[in-house]
């Protein structure tokens, strides 16, 4: 079924389709409409939806639900992740039970924010996957995939919509809500759930050992795709990939394009593209995360690329 949806509503639909049982959040543009949409449906859908007193509490509510085997999501704007950073960073070590998605909506150009910090930095800091949607359809699709990735690797997964994705409207293909599993069950396991140094050290090693598998899984995602037309190339992430596609089409230019939608970025995907171009322009919103990665890979795969 197709519906004309706001990006944030597409994310909310994805949460319902994934069968999440708990959604918590703290309001802040550009993320607020996710909980706004879900709250009136909570009783009908059998989902616990709440505005928490702050982002840290919202994060901990979602963590608690996840540890009972319930899929959960937490929503906030980018600066809210500062408030929630303590439990977020430690959760990467302790891991999840049911899939858990952390939705941190960034605000390039400070439309309604005090800074332009980039949530992708937090994902890299915590060593967890981050999905960067370019439009409302990708926002819905990535939400569904994020829950599956979270359960596959036992870590939270970040969804990072930006303002023009959260507040754009588009025709979105949606499905029906997934039936939730049996009631929540909490299993006492101090070695995995109590963040003492004696537990954290081996869990850190475990997290590091997951990184190769995470990168290999993300490498195969359709959101990382390229078209090679000439030796002049553009590498763009998130909604910047749409901007690049429109610009190239408008100029009727023979320009190669690699679109990036997932982090950590695949060395192979970027390296293979760099070997086919002699000049490259990187386009992304906010911090030069893709640019820094491209520079690093270029030294190995194509040192002469401009």
Predicted segments with their positions:
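Flexible, low-complexity linker and terminal segments
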Residues: 1-8, 12, 18, 133-306
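Thiamine diphosphate
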Residues: 1-136, 164, 226-228, 254, ...
């Amino acid at each position: 079924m197709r519906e004309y949806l706001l990006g944030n509503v597409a994310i909310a639909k994805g949460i319902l389709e994934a069968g999440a049982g708990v959604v918590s959040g703290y309001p802040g543009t550009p993320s607020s409409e996710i909980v706004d949409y879900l709250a009136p449906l909570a009783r009908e859908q059998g989902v616990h939806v709440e505005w928490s007193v702050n982002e840290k509490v919202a994060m901990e509510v979602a963590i608690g639900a996840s540890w009972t085997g319930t899929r959960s999501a937490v929503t906030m704007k980018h600066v809210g992740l500062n408030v929630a950073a303590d439990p977020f960073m430690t959760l990467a070590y302790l891991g999840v039970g049911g899939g858990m998605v952390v939705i941190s909506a960034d605000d390039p150009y400070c439309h309604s924010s005090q800074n332009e910090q980039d949530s992708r930095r937090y994902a890299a800091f915590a060593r967890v996957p981050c999905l960067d949607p370019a439009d409302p359809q990708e926002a819905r699709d990535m939400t569904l995939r994020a829950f599956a990735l979270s359960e596959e690797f036992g870590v939270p997964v970040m969804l990072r919509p930006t303002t023009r994705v959260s507040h754009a409207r588009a025709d979105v293909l949606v499905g029906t809500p997934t039936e939730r599993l049996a009631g929540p069950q909490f299993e006492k396991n101090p070695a995995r759930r109590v963040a003492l140094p004696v537990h954290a050290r081996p869990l850190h090693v475990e997290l590091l050992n997951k990184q190769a598998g995470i990168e290999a899984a993300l490498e195969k995602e359709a959101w990382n795709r390229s078209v090679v037309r000439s030796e002049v190339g553009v590498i763009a992430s998130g909604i910047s990939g749409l901007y690049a596609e429109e610009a190239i089409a408008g100029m009727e230019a023979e320009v190669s394009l690699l679109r990036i939608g997932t982090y950590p970025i695949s060395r192979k995907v970027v390296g293979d593209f760099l070997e086919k171009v002699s000049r490259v322009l990187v386009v992304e919103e906010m911090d030069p995360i893709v640019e820094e990665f491209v520079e690093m890979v270029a030294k190995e795969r194509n040192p002469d690329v401009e």
